[in-house]
Amino acid sequence: MPDGSARLLRQRHGHHLSPVKIRFHGQNGENIVSSGLDSCLMSFSIDHDSKNKSLGRASFNKIETRKSGLKLDEHKMPPIVDFASDETKQSDWDSIICVHQGLRLATSWDYIKSTMGKHTVDNERFSQNENKYSNVVATVNIEVVPA
């Protein structure tokens, strides 16, 4: 550089806190999706570091989070403790669904756009007796049936 400063050649990133769940994404197994205690969902490529990407941090209100800045994130959701993914039709709809610690709702994520989806899944039977389900972690299973 003309001013004597160095240029950034490569930059690696990962979870800021410990990962909670790690699993392969896709049929060929080239990508690994992981969730961490930092409420982030990340994708790591086995093929090349340049294909690694962050799918973002789980937030109750993304718009307010952007306005206030990430360091003052009062809308951050609890850590993702379980998730399921399937790449079938992932260009048409969200392909990942996540369960958060201590919450009865599940959030959707778009792998292609690398963002948290607009959909949340909340079962009505859990809202009728919250004390009964407050310490239960739901299991997520996505089944795609060919038409």
What feature does the model see in each segment?
Residues 1-2, 22, 35, 41-48, ...:
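WD40-repeat beta-propellers
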Residues 37-66, 72, 83-85:
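Leucine-rich repeat domain C-terminal region
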Residues 79-113:
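Structured, charged interaction cores in eukaryotic nuclear gene-expression proteins
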Residues 22-30, 84-93, 141-146:
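Loop/turn segments within WD40 beta-propeller blades
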Residues 105-107, 113-147:
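Alpha-solenoid helical-repeat scaffolds
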Residues 5, 12-19, 58-64, 73-79, ...:
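WD40/WD-repeat beta-propeller blade N-cap
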Residues 7-10, 52-54, 117:
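A structural motif specific to WD40 beta-propellers
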Residues 8, 28-33, 41-42, 92-98, ...:
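Structural hallmark of WD40 beta-propellers
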